[in-house]
Amino acid sequence: MSRIEISTESLDLPLVHAFTIARSSETVARTTIVRALWNGLEGLGETAPSARYDESVESARAAIAAHPLGDDPYALENAFDGLPPAARCGLDIAFHDLIGKDCERPLYQLFGLDPGKTPVTSFTIGIAPISEMIAKVREVGTHPIIKIKLGKGAEIETIGAIRDIYTGTIRVDANEGWTPEQSVTLLRELARFDIEFCEQPIPAGTPERLRWIR
């Protein structure tokens, strides 16, 4: 059995629209491709480290390069011990891709999953002037679920304008941009627009305050 050879490549992907949330904005998405070579097969993984969690493309690549991996992609339980999350993510995906190719089966079959029962994810709309957000929603077309980033003001006006043109499921995400008091006030007002849920309304690490909102 041959040793697993790992290589990584950084990609800077220009975004069609600036992606703005309550705490940051970006026009380029930085991601890392992970390639795992083993027994003539290539497994591909990807990871997108976040500065919010003290990780970067550079730190993820360095962690992957320094980590011993052995010669068995099936030895998943202990393979990634000690790795930070972004590096672990990229390697985990690459190893699973290797396993699927080695077994000549798609992963959903190896996991015993029914593709027809796959949950539909949301399409995310970043913060922008309301007219721009409306245009982005129109670009989405008939996608059944959208997630709207909030947290910089004009929340009620924004969601009201979007609900006027969009009949699907709406989720909102404040990315820690509100206080508990603001959260209660805004969520009560937003309820009339049939919002499925609100993600991360207040700063992380304060579960007792989140409990108070609930």
Over which residues does each language-model region extend?
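Short amphipathic
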Residues: 3-11, 120-127
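Conserved, mostly hydrophobic/aromatic
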Residues: 34, 40, 91, 104, ...
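Hydrophobic faces of well-ordered beta-strands that scaffold small-molecule active sites
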Residues: 43-45, 119-125, 144-148, 170-174, ...
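Catalytic pocket of metal/acid-base enzymes, prominently hydrolases
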Residues: 99-123
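Short, acidic/polar
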Residues: 127-140, 153, 181-186
